[in-house]
């Protein structure tokens, strides 16, 4: 009887945890796809695609500390920078931290670097290293809304000259 109970309990645990792990893996892949889309759309200067996963009521802070609310402001700001100071730049990013706070909320922090600024054309008051790279730390909070992952918080800060920067891959 005791053996039957242990087998039954183990089976129930496996039954209820396997779909959760499988779902978390699927959600992780969906978020990873969004991160890859961010890079490819930035590199092609496509603000529409770059902004498509940003929530209607999302908030974001850019590298200058300016705060914005809403999808339209996020889109408008990226249209502006892709035509201006970040035109034809190249974004790369490495995931530093990725964790789920709940089945519907994930936090992703990336170390980013941007290259391709024209000589003397980098953004004012932002540190560009000796190799012409702007380094930032980007924290994004994702929330699952109606089955889709949306960015509800986007907080980007530039790394100051005395901040150690890990070696890029």
Where are these regions (language model features)?
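Sec/Tat signal peptide C-region and signal peptidase I cleavage site
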Residues: 18-22
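A beta-strand edge to alpha-helix "cap/lid" segment located at domain peripheries
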Residues: 23-36, 40-52, 59-169
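Positively charged n-region of N-terminal signal peptides that target proteins for export
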Residues: 1-4
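N-terminal hydrophobic alpha-helix used for membrane targeting or insertion
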Residues: 6-7, 98
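Bacterial N-terminal signal peptides
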Residues: 7-15
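Aromatic-residue hotspot detector
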Residues: 14-17, 100
């Amino acid at each position: 009887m005791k053996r039957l109970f242990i087998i039954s309990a183990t089976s129930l645990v496996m039954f209820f945890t396997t779909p959760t792990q499988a779902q978390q893996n699927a959600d992780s892949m969906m978020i990873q796809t969004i991160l890859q889309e961010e890079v490819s759309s930035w590199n092609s200067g496509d603000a529409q695609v770059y902004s498509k996963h940003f929530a209607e009521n999302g908030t974001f802070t850019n590298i200058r500390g300016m705060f914005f609310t809403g999808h339209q402001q996020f889109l408008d700001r990226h249209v502006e920078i892709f035509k201006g100071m970040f035109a034809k730049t190249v974004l790369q990013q490495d995931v530093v931290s990725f964790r789920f706070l709940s089945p519907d909320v994930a936090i992703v922090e990336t170390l980013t670097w941007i290259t391709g600024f024209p000589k003397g054309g980098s953004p004012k008051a932002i540190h560009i290293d000796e190799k012409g790279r702007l380094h930032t730390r980007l924290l994004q909070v994702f929330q699952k809304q109606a089955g889709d992952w949306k960015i509800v918080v986007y907080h980007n800060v530039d790394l100051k000259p005395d901040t150690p920067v890990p070696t890029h891959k």
